[in-house]
Amino acid sequence: MKILVTGASGFIGSYIVEEALRQGMETWAAVRPTSSRKYLQDERIHFINLNLSSEEELEKELAPHEFDYIVHAAGATKCLHAEDFYKVNTEGTKYLVNAILHLGMPIKRFVFVSSLSIFGAIREEQPYQEICENDVPKPNTAYGKSKLAAEHYLDSIGNNFPYIILRPTGVYGPREKDYFLMAQSIKQHVDFAVGFKRQDITFVYVQDVVQAVFLALDHGMNGRKYFLSDGEVYQSEAFSDLIHKELGNPWMLRIKAPIWVLRIVTFFGEYLGRMTGKMSALNNDKYNILKQRNWRCDIEPAMDELGYHPHYPLERGVKLAIKWYKDNGWL
């Protein structure tokens, strides 16, 4: 079987490539000319440069190939301007799908890696309820809006295209850079949290996302959408407490600030990012993400229909991630 993975040099994409190789697939990694191949060193990997900003170029680049499976994991999570999210996440998906259709490529399955973020701050009344597939998305970030627009485009094609959408919650694990910043701060004995209202959060380890991807490729139902988490719900301090435990620090100062403090910090982070041309991790989208109180989601459909069973509870996943950060000189 021949598989194409977009975003192959990214956090999730690189793990998908590794699993495809493990399963003996002819594995093609779509990367940009400027992308790092640090985690794509296996000599069995075939590389292809795809220009997701041009449907015409995509057709030319894909024309010599017939892929059985395509996993679209490419996407922008931080951009200097909101419209850039749409160019990458929405238009990039649209152009890729159109190129596949115009070429008449007989793919068996197209898996789109979306996000729980497309739903925004819904079901925020306590006690919090799980976000379900029948809920109406109300994305509150440019990232979430762009991913939702990509989903809508896939839905508009209908049954003529064999797609499945995965909506993971916060994905963490070795190589991940955003949660790593929290670990860096805690190593310096500081844990910064915002908001005093209860916050229910969910996580999913990267290998569990990979598990779901290949289950979807194997026997998912066309047009279905699945939430992914480890099946548990945590309070906002759980992640930092586990990091602190694994780091073995003798003490940690937890600073909890009002939401308005975060608003000021992210405002200036966004401003400085645009001035310097390098987007800060603390930006306007991050403000809405950190402000959101309910990240519960219903993974029962993924378990029932895909056979998805998360193998990495938070304690195990954090232990593995921190060990990797230490072993690789990140911490």
Regions found by a protein language model. Name each.
Residues 297-305, 309, 313-331:
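Amphipathic terminal alpha-helices
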Residues 216-282, 315, 319-322:
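Mid/C-terminal beta-alpha module of Rossmann-like enzyme folds, strongest
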Residues 138-164:
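Active-site Tyr-X1-5-Lys
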